[in-house]
Amino acid sequence: GQDENKYDGFLQSSLYQEIFCNDFLGQVPPIDLKKEKQFHDFVMKLNDNEIINSAHDISDGGLLPCMIEMLLFNKLGIDINLPTKIQTPNEENLLFLHGWLFGEDQSRIIISTNKPDKLMEFSKSENIKIYCIGKTNNTGVVEIPKYDSICINKCLDLYNNTIPKLFP
């Protein structure tokens, strides 16, 4: 539901705001119900036409947590394709990067496919904006170029062991 020109994200009333700011204030992300329905119909058509392997909305935690959830159990990695505006690390871009990675904007879904050309063609015919956020690989590392990297095995360990450690 977005293209490369969308490089910020909605952080008000988000999990990010709650964790990093110890706050949960502000408006919830705005939603255009007509656009939302169009977008979900589009994803259903992609599925019906066997163009996608999986789809996951980013509403809880944003793009990065969603990507990690999708990669976790297959221990895959991804080279993230950052929007041009935030590819150069500096203070302003770091703020935009956090919004892009953790914003809980509506009408954003991560789709995995083995048919990227068909996906692009179909999105144009349906007038839906899409952006290739990256390509998966077998490294087990989420690579955020020029910023950071995240080891999927560490995420899997946290996923499997956090609750047992808190409640022995």
Please state what every model-predicted region is:
Residues 1-31, 44-47, 105-106, 113-115:
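Mobile "lid/hinge" segments at catalytic clefts and subdomain interfaces of large enzymes
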Residues 25-27, 40, 46-168:
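Glycine-/charge-enriched secondary-structure boundary and capping motifs
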Residues 31-38:
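C-terminal transmembrane module of polytopic alpha-helical membrane proteins
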